[in-house]
Design a protein with these regions (language model features):
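Glycine-rich adenosyl-nucleotide cofactor-binding module
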Residues: 143, 154-204, 215-233
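Intrinsic-disorder-associated, low-complexity terminal segments enriched in Asp/Asn/His/Tyr and depleted
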Residues: 266, 351-354, 380-382
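S-adenosylmethionine
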Residues: 271-342, 380-416
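Short strand-turn motif at the edge of the Rossmann-like AdoMet-binding core
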Residues: 3, 7-8, 337-340
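Class I S-adenosyl-L-methionine
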Residues: 127-147, 174-176, 385-428
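Glycine-biased, low-complexity coil/linker segments
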Residues: 208-211, 346-347, 352-356, 360-363, ...
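Conserved S-adenosyl-L-methionine
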Residues: 190-203, 210, 214-262, 268-278, ...
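Non-catalytic nucleic-acid substrate-recognition regions in nucleic-acid-modifying enzymes
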Residues: 6-7, 16-147
Length: 428
């Protein structure tokens, strides 16, 4: 079976997540934001709730080398027509590619064929050649009463498929903005990024079913985003620690809110006050399967003395990694965020001359790095024996759309942000 995945705003990060989750299959990057997975395993619709980097996914049913509407129509009619209809059938068409495919003729002819079969229909259209996940969700195109037909141009062919599920944007927004305890001043990790980090730390996590026994630690738990997302992904043994009493209170409140909102049962979690640089005093050696965390990233407001901040954070992270190595199991992973300061934080070039820069790997291509700001002020903590893992499969590492740093990490952020996130995967 072949599945397609429409990737999020950071395709490299999204692809790395898919490679970790679906390590039993063969991944191909069809376009900058389209991945194709060939696998023997059936992928259920609810997987979309556990992979943060995918906007929509579906099953590829056929392929054709023809650009003619009639040839495409003949194929999509075999897998897109409903078996039984109770109300007016809704359908939409999304085309990912640069070829000239007449979507208007295709949509009108498909609507005509449905009517000839006694099926009244409504064609859902958009100004763009692709339908957003919001449009797909609002028009119920992933239900039995609808369909989003997806056409992907790749390798001189058109791959024809149907969307199975789209990212649950309402739920993600609810968890991000509806939580009872938020600390906007110290920063908030987006739930989608938390899911990606969890999957990078524990390969194939959503595919293993509920009730997994791995022990997950977040030693800078903040308001508990990583822990609550791990709960929703089926993990049952969670540990959170922080040096801030308020952070622990916020985490406890948010965990309780998630448990009540989603009616979760049998989740074991422990919260305790601890400095991350002394956490081995609280946990046994080799007792933790994965450490996933966004540590303190430095002050986010006011005039920043970047050189001083970098020095302080490097000391904090180096000492923390030394402790993590004591409590983490052999081959266990640490997935953490390191801050990357953009050049917009400083004035003249002379002000920035002493900042260590973070170079993006040249094989990422100009298209891959075009949206990146000028990055500088990156950290280089002592890894204390940990190894940085390249999360991209070897077969895709030279793809022109892959955007890694020179040290094989990924950078995440938006153009207006002064501090970006560097996602680092470490292995013991």
């Amino acid at each position: 079976m072949k599945y397609f995945f429409v990737l999020g705003i950071n395709p490299t990060l999204s692809l790395a997540e898919l490679a970790a989750v679906f390590n039993h299959g063969e991944l191909t990057l069809a376009q900058k934001n389209i991945a194709i997975l060939e696998t023997d395993q059936k992928i259920e619709a609810n997987i979309i709730k556990k992979i943060g980097g995918t906007i929509k996914f579906g099953l590829i049913h056929d392929k054709t080398a023809s650009l003619m509407a009639q040839d495409i129509l003949k194929s999509i009619a075999t897998f897109s027509k409903p078996e039984k209809i109770e109300t007016k059938f809704k359908f939409g068409i999304s085309f990912y590619g640069k070829a000239k495919v007449n979507l208007k003729i295709l949509g009108m002819e498909f609507k005509k064929r449905l009517l000839q079969s006694g099926i009244p229909s409504r064609w859902v259209v958009s100004r763009e050649p692709t339908l957003s996940s919001v449009v797909v969700e609002q028009n119920k195109l992933t239900t039995a009463q609808g369909a989003e037909i997806v056409i992907i141009q790749f390798d001189k062919k058109l791959f024809l498929g149907k969307t199975i599920a789209v990212q649950p944007f309402k739920e993600l927004s609810f968890r991000d903005y509806g939580r009872p305890a938020r600390d906007d001043y110290s920063g908030m990790l987006p739930p989608k990024l938390a899911q990606i980090m969890i999957n990078l730390a524990l390969a194939s996590s959503p595919c293993q079913g509920e009730g997994r026994g791995e022990v997950i630690l977040d030693p800078f738990c903040g308001s508990g985003t990583i822990l609550t997302e791990a709960m929703l992904m089926g993990y049952k043994n969670l540990i959170g620690a922080d040096i801030s009493d308020r952070a622990l209170q916020d985490t406890k409140a948010n965990i309780g809110w998630i448990e009540k909102s989603y009616e979760l049962r049998d989740v074991s979690y422990e919260l305790f006050h601890s400095d991350a640089t002394k956490i081995s005093k609280c946990l046994a050696a080799n007792s933790v399967d994965a450490i996933i965390t966004e540590p303190y990233l430095g002050p986010q407001r006011g005039k920043l003395e970047i050189e001083k901040i970098i020095k302080e954070l490097e000391e904090l992270y180096s000492r923390s990694l030394m402790e993590f190595k004591k409590i983490l199991k052999t081959n266990g992973r640490v997935v953490m965020v390191w801050p990357v300061f953009t050049l917009s934080l400083r004035g003249s070039a002379s002000d920035r001359s002493n900042l260590p820069s973070l170079s993006l790997r040249a094989t990422g291509g100009s298209e891959a790095i075009s949206r990146m700001p000028s990055l500088a002020g990156s950290l280089n903590p002592n890894l204390n024996g940990f190894t940085i893992i390249n999360p991209i499969p070897a077969s895709l590492q030279k793809n022109i759309f892959i955007n890694l740093t020179a040290r094989r990490t990924m950078v995440y952020g938006r153009e207006q942000q002064k501090v970006w996130r560097e996602i680092v995967v470490l292995e013991k």
